[in-house]
């Protein structure tokens, strides 16, 4: 995976079982105009910010890692997501950060600002990398902040090209360890539409 830079944030918590705790990925937009991946990562590097993400991806695909995969970044806030659909792992609103990778995409978040192909391809590459490094990550648990947040977050906006993202996740230059069958049914339908 191409990580252009590492700029570590002090805003993280331990995962009890390291990368084995990771079950999903939460996608965010920065909701900032004209901010680069570097400026967002610099913000995360500030201890008083109290927030972070594992990765920040600029519009040009420039990727910065801010938190190690074995640590929990502070990206989801008050959130809930039942990763195994069994009422246990992640159903507790405090556990979502423990069980997810956070990826911030530099974007205004106004529903009009496009997500360039270079950025979406880089995001797919990051997710494939996480899939290789985190043995319990399930691609069906790649979701956005709106799906897990309990306080009305709206990222990602409807103009995010989810079908392209999932297409590039399952059609990389080298296939990932787990592919199409592991995707959620809605993503499989979108990928099928692209194939036609």
Where are these regions (language model features)?
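Basic/polar, cationic surfaces and motifs that engage anionic cell-wall
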Residues: 2-5, 19, 98, 106-192
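Active-site-adjacent loop/helix surface patches within enzyme catalytic domains
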Residues: 1-136
């Amino acid at each position: 995976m191409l990580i252009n830079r590492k700029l570590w944030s002090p805003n993280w918590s331990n995962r009890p079982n390291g990368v084995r705790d990771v079950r999903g990925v939460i996608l965010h937009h920065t909701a900032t105009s004209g901010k680069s991946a570097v400026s967002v990562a610099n913000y995360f590097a500030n201890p008083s910010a109290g927030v972070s993400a594992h990765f920040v991806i600029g519009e040009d695909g420039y990727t910065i890692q801010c938190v190690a995969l074995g640590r929990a970044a502070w990206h989801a806030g008050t959130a809930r997501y039942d990763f195994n659909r069994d009422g246990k792992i992640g159903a507790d609103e405090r556990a979502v950060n423990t069980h997810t990778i956070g990826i911030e995409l530099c974007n205004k978040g106004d529903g009009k600002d496009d997500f360039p192909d270079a950025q979406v391809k880089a995001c797919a590459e990051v997710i494939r990398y996480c899939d290789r490094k985190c043995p319990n990550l399930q691609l069906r648990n790649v979701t956005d902040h709106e799906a897990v947040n309990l306080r009305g977050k709206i990222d990602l906006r409807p103009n995010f090209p989810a079908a392209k993202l999932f297409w590039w996740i399952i059609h990389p230059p080298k296939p990932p360890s787990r592919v199409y069958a592991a995707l959620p049914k809605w993503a499989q339908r979108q990928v099928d539409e692209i194939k036609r």
